[in-house]
UniProtKB/Swiss-Prot annotation:
HAMAP family membership: RecR
Record key words, sorted: DNA damage, DNA recombination, DNA repair, Metal-binding, Zinc, Zinc-finger
Protein name in UniProt: Recombination protein RecR
Superkingdom assignment: Bacteria
Organism: Chlorobium phaeobacteroides (strain DSM 266 / SMG 266 / 2430)
Length: 205
């Protein structure tokens, strides 16, 4: 059964488009917003528009950052180990590693993985930017290791293998986080202790 209000149905449909949100959850969110004062809806709308207007991808690591903070705070930090770059699939995965407090190097966010079945090739993710980054004279003198920390899926493994084959001729050591993370699992849902052990136990490819 659908609601008699077209506006309600439209909002439910928009909520349901979000990852992990089914129609029932979308309905609850919609009803919640209906019961909130207009100012709450205005704040939500402003926050959504601000994200689209103010957030960009860092020109160095491709992580998300504010438009007036590029390169991002991690890339600018003098306390990071600039000899190591950890390659992750998404900004959410980067946050997962940061929460461990263990890894102190730099990052590179691919914003996806190679997936031929979905029509996603190497040119559709940030591989070219990674190669350009490690090939710059000032970077090539510093970066000694690239750690591939992609989700343990077929697509993640394919992407890791592709990147390692591109990096090895450059004389950069390539490693992959240790096994122990369940196949098919998403890094954002792995506990911090397991992620720390996976990083510590990384092995050469």
């Amino acid at each position: 059964m659908r609601y008699t209000s077209g506006a309600i149905e439209t909002l439910i449909d928009e909520f349901a488009r979000l990852p992990g949100i089914g129609r029932k959850t979308a309905q609850r969110l919609c009803m919640h917003m209906l019961n909130e004062p207009r100012t709450a809806a205005e704040k939500l709308a402003k926050a959504l528009l601000d994200v689209k207007d103010r957030v960009i991808r860092c020109s160095e690591c491709q992580n998300v950052t504010d438009r007036d903070s590029d390169p991002c705070v991690l890339c600018r930090s003098s306390g990071r180990d600039r000899t190591v770059i950890c390659v992750v699939e998404s900004p959410v995965d980067l946050l997962a590693f940061e929460k461990t407090g263990h890894y102190k190097g730099l990052y590179h966010v691919l914003h996806g993985v190679i997936s031929p079945l979905d029509g996603i090739g190497p040119d559709d993710i940030k591989v070219r930017e990674l190669l350009a980054r490690v090939s710059r004279p000032e970077e090539s003198l510093q970066v000694r290791e690239v750690v591939l920390a992609l989700n343990p899926t077929v697509e993640g493994e394919t992407t890791s293998l592709y990147i390692s084959r591109l990096l090895k001729p450059l004389g950069i050591a390539v490693s992959k986080i240790a096994r122990g993370i369940p196949v098919g699992a998403e890094l954002e849902f792995i506990d911090e202790a397991t992620l720390s052990r996976a990083m510590e136990g990384r092995s050469a490819m």
